[in-house]
C-alpha cells in the first residue's frame, strides 16, 4: 500500500523572556538583587519539516488523546476538540457535547497506539493508526484487537485541535446505529449530503475519472480492511460493485475550510469474494474546499462483512 505523505517546513520556536540588569560603571556596590523570574509560554503549534517528524507529531497527538480518555480527563478531552468536531463510532455520530458521555462510558484502559500514518493536506493533518485498548459499551466488550482509528487535526489559535475522529472498534455482532442526538444546521446538512452523494454515486456508476478528481492527494481511509490510502481507494473503486447509496441522519459541520460530513450509510458492496451487507452503518467523510473544487481528505466506513 502506498500512502502519499506531504510535509512542509517546520520550526519549533521557544519563547524566552530574559531580563538583564546592568549597573553603571564605577557605581558603588549595592545590595544584591534577586534575578528576574524567567517567563515561559507554550510554543505555538507549527508544522513538522519532514515525514518522520510528521509521524512523530501524529503519534504524540493520538497518544495524548487516549491518555486523557484513559485518565477520564474530560476537560482535556473537550479542549482537544474544535467546537464543530464530529466523532463516528459503531453507535453512531456525536458532537463535542454528546460525545462526553460516550467517551466516559467506554472505560478505556491501557491504550496502545501503533502503525501511525500521517499526511498533510492543506492545513489539515490526517492521521490513521491502530489502537489496542480494553473498552466496553452497554456491558458489551469491544474488540480487544488493535483496531483502525482516523483523526483530522488543524491548528486553531496556536494549538492542534481535532475536527473529526472515527473508531472502528465494535462489539460482535455490530448493532444498528442510532440517530445523532444533535440536529446540526439544516443548510449545512443538506450541503454535506449533496457532496457525499456526489462522491458515492461516482463510485457506484463507475465514473472513475470524476471519482478520482474528488480524492485529495494525502487522502486516508479506514475500513474493515484497515488503513488505506488514495491508491487503495481507486483500486477498490475499480474492482468493487456497490449498491445505490442511501444516506440517513446526515450531519455536516464546518471546521475552517473543512466540511465534516457524517451519516448512517446503507450501501452494500462486493469485492471479489467479499460481501459487505446493505446494512446502515456510521460513515464519515471530510471534505476540503468548496463547490466543484472540494476534495475528500479522510473517509471512515464502519460497515464490515458479517
Regions found by a protein language model. Name each.
Residues 75-112, 212-246:
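Short solvent-exposed beta->alpha transition segments
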Residues 9-24:
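Bacterial N-terminal signal peptides
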Amino acid at each position: 500500500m502506498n500512502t502519499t505523505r506531504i510535509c512542509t517546513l517546520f520550526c519549533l520556536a521557544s519563547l524566552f523572556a530574559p531580563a538583564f540588569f546592568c549597573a553603571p560603571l564605577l557605581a558603588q556596590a549595592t545590595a544584591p538583587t534577586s534575578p528576574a523570574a524567567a517567563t515561559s509560554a507554550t510554543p505555538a503549534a507549527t508544522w513538522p519539516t519532514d515525514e518522520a517528524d510528521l509521524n512523530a507529531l501524529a503519534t504524540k497527538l493520538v497518544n495524548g488523546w487516549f491518555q486523557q480518555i484513559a485518565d477520564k480527563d474530560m476537560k482535556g478531552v473537550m479542549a482537544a476538540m474544535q467546537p464543530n468536531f464530529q466523532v463516528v463510532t459503531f453507535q453512531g455520530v456525536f458532537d463535542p457535547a454528546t460525545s462526553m458521555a460516550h467517551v466516559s462510558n467506554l472505560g478505556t484502559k491501557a491504550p496502545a497506539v501503533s502503525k501511525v500514518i500521517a499526511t498533510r493536506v492543506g492545513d489539515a493533518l490526517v492521521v490513521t493508526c491502530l489502537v489496542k485498548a480494553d473498552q466496553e459499551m452497554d456491558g458489551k466488550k469491544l474488540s480487544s484487537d488493535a483496531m483502525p482509528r482516523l483523526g483530522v487535526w488543524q491548528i486553531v489559535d496556536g494549538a492542534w485541535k481535532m475536527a473529526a475522529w472515527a473508531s472502528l472498534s465494535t462489539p460482535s455482532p455490530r448493532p444498528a446505529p442510532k440517530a445523532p442526538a444533535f440536529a446540526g444546521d439544516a443548510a449545512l446538512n443538506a450541503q454535506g449530503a449533496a457532496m457525499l452523494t456526489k462522491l458515492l454515486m461516482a463510485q457506484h456508476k463507475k465514473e472513475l475519472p470524476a471519482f478520482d478528481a474528488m480524492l485529495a492527494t494525502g487522502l486516508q481511509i479506514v475500513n474493515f480492511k484497515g488503513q488505506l490510502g488514495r491508491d487503495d481507494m481507486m483500486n477498490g473503486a475499480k474492482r468493487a460493485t456497490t449498491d445505490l447509496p442511501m444516506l440517513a441522519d446526515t450531519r455536516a459541520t464546518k471546521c475552517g475550510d473543512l466540511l465534516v460530513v457524517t451519516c448512517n450509510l446503507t450501501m452494500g458492496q462486493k469485492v471479489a469474494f467479499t460481501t459487505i451487507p446493505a446494512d446502515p452503518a456510521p460513515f464519515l467523510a471530510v471534505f476540503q474546499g468548496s463547490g466543484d473544487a472540494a476534495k475528500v481528505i479522510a473517509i471512515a466506513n464502519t460497515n464490515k462483512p458479517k
